[in-house]
Regions:
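Conserved flavin/dinucleotide-binding core of flavoenzymes
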Residues: 3, 118-119, 318, 324-471
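Mid-domain catalytic core of redox enzymes
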Residues: 4-6, 29, 248-373, 464-471
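Short loop/edge segments at beta-strand edges and connector loops
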Residues: 14, 100-101, 246-248, 254, ...
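Glycine-rich FAD pyrophosphate-binding loop
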Residues: 27-60
Length: 471
C-alpha cells in the first residue's frame, strides 16, 4: 500500500505507556508515526489531573491555602530493575526528573521505623543487615524470611514458570513455612504494592519475580524511583518523528484480505497506515480486535490525596504496615501534601470518599503520632481498572504482540511481556510491538533491553540462569 508523503507509516491507538514506548522507539528509528489518544493527555493510567479552580487558585475556606495545582491519579514509582522504563524516560528526555532512593522506611502503627537499605556486601547479601534489624519481625520471623528468600534463588529454575503460575503466592509462602507475621509485615506489603494484587490472588511466579529482581539479583534492583514532577509533565514533551492527536478516539479498524487498512476515528475520518499498533487495556482491545479476553479481570488502586497545614513526616515516603493505607508519599515542593496509596483496593471501592479520607487520616496519626497537623483538603481517586489481575493461570493466556492481521500488532501490560502488570511491563510490550513493526517493514531493530544482570553471589543461584522469553 502506497501512502501520500504526509501520511504516517504507523498508526498507534492509545497514548498510555505501551503506546508511548512504541511511538518513541519507532519515531527514533525513522518511521513516521501518528499516535491517537482519546483523552487530552498522555500517560494512560499514569497521568495527572487538574484540581478544581478554587484549589488551583490557592483558595480554600477563607485564608487556608493549598499550593498544589495538579495531582497524579495515584503515586507511581519504579524500581532500579525497571530497565526499559528508564530507557523510555531517556528517549523522552525526562530521565533527570526521576530521583532514586536507596533507603525504604517501614513504619509500624506505634511510630517505630525500620529502614531497608543496602549496607554493603555483594548481592544477595546487600540487604541482609537491614533484614536482621527489621524490628516488626521476631528472630523466628526473620529466619523464616531469609529461608524464603533463599528459595527464591532456586525454585523458579527448578519448577518453571507454568508450574509456579498455577499456585497463589500465599500458597507458596505457606508451603515454605513463612510465619503469619512474616507474611503480613514483610511479604504482603511488598507484593501488594508491586503487583497490585493480594498474595491470596496473585501468581506465585510473579511474586517470586518481584523478590528476585527487586531484592536479590542486583544491588540496584530495590532502589525506589520517584518523579520530581506530576506524571503529566513526564509525558508532555514532543516525541521526535511522532504526531500526537489528542481527543482522537478510534471507533473501529477497517480490514480486508487479512490486513488492516486503517482506523476509523470517532468523527468518521479514516486514519490509513501501513502498520498499526493497538496499545489499549484488554477490555478496549476487545472492541477493536478479535480474540478471547474473557479470562482477564481488573484489580483497583485508590489514591488518597491529603493536604495538611504542616509536614506530617520527614522522609520522602514510607511503607505503612498492618493497616489499610499501604504507602504514604510526601511531595517535596509542598511539605503538607501527602499521597496515600491502597493497592488491590476492592474492599474500599464501595466506601464514600469521606469515609476513605477519615480512615487514612486516622491511620496516619497512628503512624506519625507526634504531629499536630490539621487536614485542610482531600481528594480521593478510584482507579477501578488500574491493572489486570495477575492471577494463577494467566501466563498461558497472555497473548503475543501478533494479531490475526499481518500488519497489526497489540501492546499493553496484559500481553505476554514476561513481567507482571507494571509500568515496566507496559513499556516492554510497546517495545515488543515496535520490534514486530520493524521486522514486518524489513528493517528489523531491537528496542527491548535485558533485565539487570545477576551480580555477586547471586550469579550462582539457578534462578540467575533463567532467561526471560522475548515477547
Amino acid at each position: 500500500m502506497t501512502l501520500p508523503a504526509d501520511q504516517p507509516d504507523v498508526v498507534i491507538v492509545g497514548g498510555g505507556l505501551a503506546g508511548l514506548a512504541a511511538a518513541a522507539a519507532l519515531g527514533a528509528a525513522g518511521f513516521r508515526v501518528d499516535l491517537h489518544e482519546r483523552r487530552p493527555f498522555l500517560g494512560g493510567r499514569a497521568s495527572s489531573w487538574e484540581l478544581p479552580p478554587a484549589v488551583s487558585n490557592g483558595q480554600m475556606d477563607g485564608d487556608l491555602k493549598v499550593a498544589a495545582t495538579s495531582i497524579d491519579n495515584c503515586q507511581h514509582v519504579l524500581l532500579g530493575c525497571c530497565t526499559n522504563l528508564l530507557d523510555l524516560y531517556e528517549r523522552l528526555g525526562v530521565r533527570h526528573l526521576i530521583s532514586f532512593h536507596d533507603a525504604v522506611p517501614f513504619v509500624t502503627p506505634d511510630g517505630r521505623v525500620s529502614t531497608m537499605q543496602e549496607r554493603g556486601g555483594p548481592a544477595p547479601l546487600h540487604l541482609l543487615a537491614s533484614l536482621a534489624r527489621f524490628h516488626p519481625l521476631s528472630w523466628r520471623d526473620r529466619l523464616a524470611v531469609m529461608a524464603g528468600l533463599a528459595a527464591v534463588g532456586f525454585e523458579p529454575a527448578m519448577l518453571g514458570r507454568l508450574r509456579l503460575d498455577s499456585e497463589t503466592m500465599l500458597a507458596w509462602l505457606q508451603r515454605h513455612l513463612q510465619t503469619p507475621r512474616a507474611i503480613d509485615y514483610f511479604w504482603r506489603p511488598v507484593l501488594t504494592s508491586a503487583l497490585n494484587e493480594d498474595p491470596e490472588r496473585v501468581s506465585a511466579w510473579h511474586g517470586l519475580q518481584v523478590f528476585w529482581l527487586g531484592f536479590l539479583a542486583n544491588r540496584a534492583g530495590h532502589r525506589v524511583g520517584l518523579p520530581a514532577v506530576p506524571l503529566g509533565e513526564l509525558y508532555g514533551a514532543q516525541i521526535p518523528g511522532v504526531r500526537v492527536h489528542f481527543r482522537s478516539a478510534v471507533r473501529e479498524l477497517r480490514h480486508e484480505a487479512g490486513r488492516v487498512a486503517g482506523a476509523r476515528l470517532d468523527d468518521g475520518r479514516m486514519a490509513p497506515a501501513r502498520w498499526l499498533i493497538v496499545a489499549l487495556p484488554f477490555e478496549e482491545t476487545a472492541r477493536l480486535l478479535p480474540g478471547d479476553y474473557s479470562a482477564f479481570s481488573h484489580s483497583p488502586i485508590i489514591g488518597i490525596h491529603l493536604w495538611f497545614d504542616r509536614p506530617l513526616f520527614e522522609a520522602p515516603f514510607a511503607a505503612l504496615l498492618g493497616r489499610t493505607v499501604q504507602w504514604a508519599f510526601r511531595k517535596l515542593g509542598d511539605p503538607g501534601y501527602v499521597q496515600c496509596v491502597v493497592s488491590a483496593a476492592r474492599e474500599l471501592l464501595p466506601m464514600p470518599p469521606d469515609q476513605i479520607v477519615e480512615t487514612a487520616v486516622r491511620e496516619l496519626r497512628e503512624f506519625f503520632p507526634n504531629t499536630w497537623a490539621q487536614l485542610l483538603r482531600s481528594s480521593v481517586i478510584k482507579e477501578v481498572r488500574a491493572t489486570y489481575s495477575a492471577a494463577p493461570g494467566m501466563e498461558a493466556r497472555r497473548p503475543s504482540p501478533a494479531t490475526p492481521f499481518a500488519n497489526c500488532f497489540q501492546a499493553g501490560d496484559w500481553t505476554a511481556t514476561g513481567w507482571p502488570p507494571t509500568m515496566e511491563g507496559a513499556v516492554r510490550s510497546g517495545y515488543a510491538a515496535a520490534e514486530r513493526v520493524t521486522q514486518a517493514a524489513g528493517r528489523p531493530q531491537r528496542f527491548l533491553l535485558p533485565e539487570l544482570p545477576a551480580e555477586g553471589l547471586s550469579r550462582w543461584f539457578p534462578t540467575a540462569r533463567i532467561t526471560e522469553p522475548r515477547p
